Amino acid sequence: MVNEHKAHASFMFKIINVFVSFGFNLILGILIYDIFFNIDENLVVACILIAMPIIAFLILILTGGVHKELTYLQIYDKYKLMCEFIREITISTITSELATIATMILYQLQNPIKTITFLLLLIAFLAFGLIFTKLLIDAYFITLKKLKSLKE
């Protein structure tokens, strides 16, 4: 039998992952489009400011729901759910980073900017992506280590 609180928390974690990924992809998409097609900065800010408060509000509501559901679980189950959440958000972040790199390459082929500028942007994006992914992987291993110590 499935613990209903664990199922609710897991489902809310998955929805949080979707909203975080959407926000991440939205910002990356707008910035990359701005770099290659030089759209108006006010439009960039407006696009981000319209969507982000809605996404942040939904994430906040869902985080409160997850916190409520986690109060009913044992500490082992909490860490197990956190491991799953961190693993899923890491995978979706890596997917977003790779999709953004592919988009940058396609935009460079279609609407080229200076090669040195493109390479610097690509290197900066890769560095940011690797650092962010490394932090997520470190968080996963720390949570996994705590989970293993609780299992013993």
UniProtKB/Swiss-Prot annotation:
One Gene Ontology cellular component: plasma membrane
Keywords for this protein: Cell membrane, Membrane, Transmembrane, Transmembrane helix
Subcellular location: Cell membrane
Membrane topology, as annotated: Multi-pass membrane protein
Record InterPro entries: DUF5418
Membrane-spanning residues: 15-35, 43-63, 117-137
Main location: membrane
First and last residue of the signal peptide: none
Family listed: To M.jannaschii MJ0129 and MJ0587.
Protein's recorded name: Uncharacterized protein MJ0554
UniProt organism field: Methanocaldococcus jannaschii (strain ATCC 43067 / DSM 2661 / JAL-1 / JCM 10045 / NBRC 100440) (Methanococcus jannaschii)
Lineage: Archaea, Methanobacteriati, Methanobacteriota, Methanomada group, Methanococci
